[in-house]
Structure formats: C-alpha cells, structure tokens
C-alpha cells in the first residue's frame, strides 16, 4: 500500500516538474522580457493569447495576416496559450536552434580575415543568392536591429549572442 502512495506522489509531481523546468530554462530578466512580450500580445488582457490577439498584434506591426496564417500559428500550441504555455513554446523553439558555436562558425566561413565581422553588402549578397535564399525585405528585417558598425561591418559574434541570449538594454 505504501508503494501505491509513492507511485501516486511521483505521478502528481511530474507535471509540476515539467512546468518548473520551463522557468528554469531562462534567467529572471529573460522571463520578465517574455512576460512583457506576452502582455503586449494579449490585447484583451484575459491572460490568454487567442487568434484575435495575434491578429491585432500583427496588424499593429503593419501586417495583414490571413485567417489560415493565424490558424497555423495557433495550431502550434497544444492548448490555450497562457504565459506558461507561451514560455514553453519559446523554450522549445530556442532549444531547436543550433548551438551558439555552430551559428558563429557558419558565419566565420565567410570571414576570411577572422575579424568577427562580415561586410553587410557581402552578407546581403550571400543571403539572397545562396542556399535558402532570403528576400531583400527579409534581409532588411534582419539588419534592422543587427549589430552593424558605421563602416557597414556586420558583427556576427554579437549577432549570435543576441540570437541565443537576447539583446542587451541600451542602458547597459
């Protein structure tokens, strides 16, 4: 009988552990950033992100998403998207990205002088003509917040850090 109690306790604790692992994946400042993003998307402030919230958020960014596009986004979640689900989905997406050194090494292949930078025009040419080709608009979007100095050098080491860990505040 005591073994049944132990099994029951273990079974009850598993979902809790899975949930707390989501929060353990990120540091406190990252969780706060995700919370702010969640609140910006949750337009009606009901604690859940629904299709209308997504539509309103994308519309505020100048996009005009189709119902099919919104449905596809909503179907990525196994259920209602509360903050914990939102964090879980981001955790899964971030874990699905390549390790930092793999991303950095991919850029380094085009950095013949090992400076940690690539000329932005050269990178644009590579991105729009090789492999899974980017459109000019996609490259513009990438460059919008990218670490590019006044001479047009794209700092791929810093970009990789931002990609994996988030942007530093401008005040830091």
Curated annotation (Swiss-Prot):
GO molecular function, one term: myosin heavy chain binding
InterPro entries found in the cross-reference section: EF-hand-dom_pair, EF_Hand_1_Ca_BS, EF_hand_DJBP, EF_hand_dom, Myosin_RLC
Phosphothreonine found at: 19
Bias kind Basic residues: ranges: 1-16
Tissue specificity comment: Ubiquitously expressed in various hematopoietic cells.
Post-translational modification note: Phosphorylation increases the actin-activated myosin ATPase activity and thereby regulates the contractile activity. It is required to generate the driving force in the migration of the cells but not necessary for localization of myosin-2 at the leading edge. Phosphorylation is reduced following epigallocatechin-3-O-gallate treatment.
Keyword vocabulary terms for this entry: Calcium, Metal-binding, Motor protein, Muscle protein, Myosin, Phosphoprotein, Repeat
Keyword Phosphoprotein tagged: yes
GO terms of biological process kind: regulation of cell shape
Annotated CDD domains: EFh (cd00051)
Residues recorded with modification Phosphoserine: 20
General remark: This chain binds calcium.
Quaternary structure (record): Myosin is a hexamer of 2 heavy chains and 4 light chains: interacts with myosin heavy chain MYO19.
Protein name in UniProt: Myosin regulatory light chain 12B
Organism: Homo sapiens
């Amino acid at each position: 009988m005591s073994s049944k109690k132990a099994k029951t306790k273990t079974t009850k604790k598993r979902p809790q552990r899975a949930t707390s692992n989501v929060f353990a994946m990120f540091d406190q400042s990252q969780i706060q950033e995700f919370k702010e993003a969640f609140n910006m998307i949750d337009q009606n402030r009901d604690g859940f992100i629904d299709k209308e919230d997504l539509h309103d958020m994308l519309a505020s960014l100048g996009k005009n998403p189709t119902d099919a596009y919104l449905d596809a986004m909503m179907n990525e979640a196994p259920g209602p998207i509360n903050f914990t689900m939102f964090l879980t989905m981001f955790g899964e997406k971030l874990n699905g990205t390549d390790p930092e050194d793999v991303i950095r090494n991919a850029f380094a292949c085009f950095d013949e002088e090992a400076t940690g930078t690539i000329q932005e025009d050269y990178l644009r040419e590579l991105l729009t003509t090789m492999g899974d080709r980017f459109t000019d608009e996609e490259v513009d979007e990438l460059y919008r917040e990218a670490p590019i100095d006044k001479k047009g050098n794209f700092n791929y080491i810093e970009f990789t850090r931002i990609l994996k860990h988030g942007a530093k505040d401008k005040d830091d």
